[in-house]
């Protein structure tokens, strides 16, 4: 938002030219995320405690885990809020890769949210197998977009650059999708 608001004015006010630099926007995005987490963190913890949204510790678990009983869960909400807030404020929202990152983070956050909700309702979250499958699906969606729908895709899109080996760049072809799913 700040990029779209202030950068067009840089022709009249030269000090606003800093908004074109990704390093400037990245630094202030990080500062914004930190400030938001400090401002909202205690409030969110109090709200989660008020609504009794906390960890339930099994009786057959280790004794030192008993002290964690009632610890607020769903901390990912704070992370997602600060991430989305700082991204929407500082990023160039016309960049399709920003939206791809927002999709990935939101997708993984939805998986975590589902896991936390099931932990609260049933005492156990989603299985490791289901979580892995859902994460792979989000990763594959990103990979499919990058491989088949990205207008900026080049002939090097499926090549793997190996550090220190300038000439060695194997073309992964369709295996690129599995590589992306593994990396993400």
What do the predicted segments below correspond to?
Residues 2-184:
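"…together with the soluble PPM/PP2C metallo-phosphatase catalytic core" -> "…together
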